[in-house]
């Protein structure tokens, strides 16, 4: 039995990656010092592999993003960045003023930089995999370089602002891209490399027959090289074509789907290739039931095993988690522990006496009263009492808002003072009373500022919240937060996903104190601010033995209890943030109807409010076209969307959807940029929207929360936004 593993987190046990990268950006360390620290992290990653697996991967530590590294390797550098000058160009592409677009990697919480293919004149600019291979070779360590495959690279790229997905377009680009990959492989083999690991996760997407013909042509060009292909996140879309590729070995993910196993049983597996069975879950942090896993490996007759997908979706180790609920830590396996599980499986198949644990979750942290509530749900639980048109009439009478009402998305700048006070409170250096008094002062200040600016619907600023998911996770039963469970989101940004380990329920009000205090300071409506069930679930780890639908409904019930408390306290507008609604959708569109059915139900269960309560939904996407029909089924009254980057073009999704009647908060200010938008810039976006939607449906707001901006940017931008609304009212009030 041979053990492969891949994607070990580069972050470091003490987030050394983040510190070194940010120190380099700030000029605190030189380029050489930065590279030395990265080399130490490389060695740390490889030592973890060497202890547990047979095939040690290299080329796994990117200075920012592995897709960007691939773009550099093949010379896909847009003209605006000029001649490639090493790290200065690299980080300009990653985070400069004209940086590449960033988006989610398949349906995960990792973000990658989208390559821009301009001329299609690829060249081998820098053989990064070879450099890493030779680095380890100089240390006496043999590795198998890991490379993003050519098909996935193009599939994740854009040309002229459009995704490169059409087979004819891909074929043209492959004529120039394939020779570059050949050169990379040739140089590796010439230097004694015995195996090259090629990641092709795009093979699991909705591909046509023409795509697979193209894939076969591409890989026939590589038939002499020792390639092993890795696929993950779902089943390969054409099993028979996949297993016929002329390569040394093929990895299949047997965790995320059932189709790979069904296809294996139906079509078998070629005897001239190595089957690498991805049987240890790389996305969820639970210890595997190794007895069951061993039975599956036996059934497959696999001669090699691995994790199902990259381990960078997990924290490094559960070893230092000392404040988790009783009985939880021993059920956890982070990246290091996953490698150990693979080693135990290998020893078992080699006939060594090892214990294959059977982890049981059956009765762990279960609350039957919540299960009972879910069983009692009826179709009316997922529908509001009155239809939208009737709710709209009631709400307009109740709220008496002007035309083009203005608001923000929720958070305001979290200054270093706010972060310091929160840290002091968590360390026990100040009392709860002192901390709450400080938060009240911040709320009072932000309400005053919003009133002075002239916003119509106010927010409390979210100064008490570190993170929109972690805040609720800390207040709900059945969800744990970690001390050191850091995962990389993009660049140097890390977050700690909460762990949904039991039945989720609410212990008491979570947001009431701060929101009702803010409302007491003003006559204007203050929005209640909640995170939706799909986002809490999608940005957390959760149990594998409980259906996703049930977990989502548990969270939705808890959020709905909060909505009802806010209503009782006189709050007339409640916003439910659901940025994960689209991104949690399965990779394959054939699985969308089932997912969206329960995702829509979960939102509607959470949002089941009185007719006079105006429910806002916030979703920060730039592409609604694919999911507009599903969004239309959500029971909100107003949806706020990003519109600034697309200059209002996002609204075409609503133009193409006949029968749209709900209100839309148009994000006219791109908060990801430090620039203060002018009234005219923002007006052009609203005018684009007014070509399609009636003026009565339009709100004016930033496209996202303002937590990461500073006050010097926020105040003038919001003033311009309010001036815009006043200008629009003058212009359109009598039309």
From Swiss-Prot:
It comes from the Bacteria. Gene3D superfamilies: 3.20.20.210. One of its GO terms (biological process) is methylation. The active site is at residue 672. CDD domains: CIMS_C_terminal_like, CIMS_N_terminal_like. InterPro entries: Cbl-indep_Met_Synth_N, Cobalamin-indep_Met_synthase, Met_Synth_C/arc, UROD/MetE-like_sf. GO terms for molecular function: 5-methyltetrahydropteroyltriglutamate-homocysteine S-methyltransferase activity; zinc ion binding. Pathway: Amino-acid biosynthesis; L-methionine biosynthesis via de novo pathway; L-methionine from L-homocysteine (MetE route): step 1/1. L-methionine binds at residues 409-411, 462, 577. Its cofactor is Zn(2+). L-homocysteine binds at residues 409-411, 462, 577. Zn(2+) binds at residues 618, 620, 642, 704. Binds 1 zinc ion per subunit. Keywords: Amino-acid biosynthesis, Metal-binding, Methionine biosynthesis, Methyltransferase, Repeat, Transferase, Zinc. It catalyses: 5-methyltetrahydropteroyltri-L-glutamate + L-homocysteine = tetrahydropteroyltri-L-glutamate + L-methionine. It holds the Pfam family Meth_synt_2. 5-methyltetrahydropteroyltri-L-glutamate binds at residues 15-18, 104, 493-494, 539, 583. Its EC number is 2.1.1.14. Catalyzes the transfer of a methyl group from 5-methyltetrahydrofolate to homocysteine resulting in methionine formation. Belongs to the vitamin-B12 independent methionine synthase family. This is 5-methyltetrahydropteroyltriglutamate--homocysteine methyltransferase. It comes from Thermotoga petrophila (strain ATCC BAA-488 / DSM 13995 / JCM 10881 / RKU-1). The lineage of its organism: Bacteria, Thermotogati, Thermotogota, Thermotogae, Thermotogales. The gene is metE.
